Amino acid sequence: MKLFITITPNLEKLLHNEIKDILRTNKLTLPKFQVFEGGIEIDLTKDPNISEQEKEYYLWSISNCSRLAESIRIRVGLSFPCKNFSQFNINLEKLDYKTYFPTSSIEPQVAVSCNASTLYHTNAIKERFIKHFNNSIKDKISIDINYSKFKPIKKLLKNLRYKLRKIQNPNDDEIIGGGDDHEIIGDDEELSEEEILNRIDKLQIELEQVIGKQKNIPQSKVFIRIDQNVGQLSVDACTSGEGQLLHKRTLNKHISDAPIRETLASAIIMAIISSTRRVGSGTTEGSYLDLNKTNIWDPFVGSGTLIQEAISMLLKAKPSSCTNYKRSFQFERFKNHSTERYLKYLESINKPISPLIKNTILIGSDIDQKAIDSSIFNLSKQGYQHENIKFFKGDFKSIYLDQINIDNSLDDDGDNNNNKPFTIITNLPYGTRVLNRNQPQQQQNQPIQPKATKIKEGENYYEDDDDDDFFSIRSPKKDNVNIYLNNSISKDLRDLFKRFGDMIHESNESVLRDVFVLNGNSHFQSISTNNGKNNFEWERILNFRNGGLTVELLKMVKKPN
């Protein structure tokens, strides 16, 4: 088994460290990793220290425990030469799909990407795969339906047909079939011919319905990538046909303007935890964030996703278990999936979790009532209702004066220990988001890194050497990825940036200790710091893309007195 776990580009090192922690926690042997732009590949096929039965636990543990993985794909077979459609068709015939396709006649979704290859027409490639599925794969997986699952119904039918023949031919001593199965409906049960026929009809309908459901369950999604005339097929192991995407943690989630997905919210918090506090010139003081030693405030709360992920981390809840609906994955429909072992695995990792938040206050605020309502709804859906989780409608400056100072001094008989400073973690408005959605956009961007050749998807730039230094990527290409921020700004947004910077400048460090913002506007740093005149500056932790927009995670650093 070879797994490819995807993530937003530039967050690969975070995912790499998280997966290593997950595997260690699950007491699984660490395999060799390969890190690509946009994902990590784990090859379990040739590792002599990993048994065949143990391999499925890697898939189970990452899918249930990862906060960062956006999808998990299983490589189907080896990569193959693919210079023309003839080679493509021949190699499709050689691949063994049966393990990763449910017994369904529904055509799969197919995603195709091509790079620097003679085959570049993605629709033509997709059409040929669908044709191959209908002509070859569908028949193979259909005959593999495990009819033993329907054994109780089949035994009842066999028994009823035996009794029917006995009624219809009472003097035929050679009637056989069903003698050992009479106990199913009882030897003493007297049934008329009509009653038996009615029961047979009902059971046949039931059997057909069960088999029909088996044949019409959602099919695995297929990914075909052809890079420099080399093809590779993968199937999505986690996203179910019902559309339960791996990164989604809340069913029917209410969203506000420009939401951030759960995986990116977790990545932001993990990156902050992984960074270190700078004290003076060239010295550090340890982690910038300990969720147990600070209160959290998101002044642009949106849908409440950052608060939601922070709570989940505080409670040490598994991403797959911090939902009020049963999470299902596509691999549960695979032919060789062991349901019994998987259920035992889930029991071992999903321990009861208290929804109570102790010793930490979490505040979300926003000027938009829709955002407040969405946040309350989403956290309530997950069972998070506690006096330490608070939401307020209002401007951040008024919330700071009216709520943050007050909550910082609360002490509920020593139980909550709320005499702790607040840390701001927030996703700022940045031009194309929220505030100036009715303003005309300027078609220009501001570079924040030198221009360089973009790394191709799938190009290997880092191999695991057990070096846990944060972002120790050993490729000059990776250090110079092209990054641009939005350069458009409205008067309202400019005013917001200035007032936000003034609040930080005037704040008491015993009340507001740290500030982390996800920024996507090139003007934010200069405006919020008053062109360097305020008593703080911004330091970039990382950058990535959020919904097609380039963003940077910044941390506030106080200037020496």
Curated annotation (Swiss-Prot):
Protein keywords: Coiled coil
InterPro entries in alphabetical order: RlmKL-like_Mtase, SAM-dependent_MTases_sf
Disulphide-bridged cysteine pairs: none
Any Pfam family hit: UPF0020
GO BP annotations listed: tRNA methylation
A Gene Ontology molecular function term of the record: tRNA (guanine) methyltransferase activity
Induction annotation: Down-regulated by Pseudomonas aeruginosa, PAO1 strain and PA14 strain infection.
Positions in coiled-coil regions: 187-217
Classification via PANTHER family: THUMP DOMAIN-CONTAINING (PTHR14911), TRNA (GUANINE(6)-N2)-METHYLTRANSFERASE THUMP3 (PTHR14911:SF13)
Protein name: Putative uncharacterized protein DDB_G0293380
Record lineage: Eukaryota, Amoebozoa, Evosea, Eumycetozoa, Dictyostelia
